[in-house]
Swiss-Prot record:
Family statement drawn from the similarity comment of this UniProt entry: Belongs to the universal ribosomal protein uL11 family.
Domain of life of the native organism: Bacteria
Source organism of the structure: Syntrophus aciditrophicus (strain SB)
Protein name, as recorded: Large ribosomal subunit protein uL11
Organismal lineage: Bacteria, Pseudomonadati, Thermodesulfobacteriota, Syntrophia, Syntrophales
HAMAP family tied to this protein: Ribosomal_uL11
Amino acid sequence: MAKKVIANIKLQIKAGKATPSPPIGPALGQHGVNIMEFCKAYNALTQSQEGMVIPVVITVYADRSFSFVTKTPPAAVLLKQAAKIAKGAGDPKRDKVGTVSAAQVREIADLKYKDLNAVNIEGAIKIIEGTARSMGIEISG
């Protein structure tokens, strides 16, 4: 018989930097999960992606055990990194804060494809292009 799931917790944590402080501690503590055990496992798994924000889905079971799945970094974070900017535009229709090439967009779409709700890679590229436009990033080429 399968374990009974009592909660699914979604967090975005910097890779290799999970600590018991908020937001991780309170989110896991209210379900009785061993916070340090999660932090050590998460940091070990995401050590190679240092500095990136990695979304994680934590499944908490009735016996207070847990499992977690990491996702690919958010498209906005990857686009900011590709355009070498700190943050998106406050008014994306008027202000353009950076530029990415079509090749960079395709590379990001390839990386994000498994987490996106897209039928094919062209659909994934359109999703990434839309995210870039909403951030005030222009796509060249």
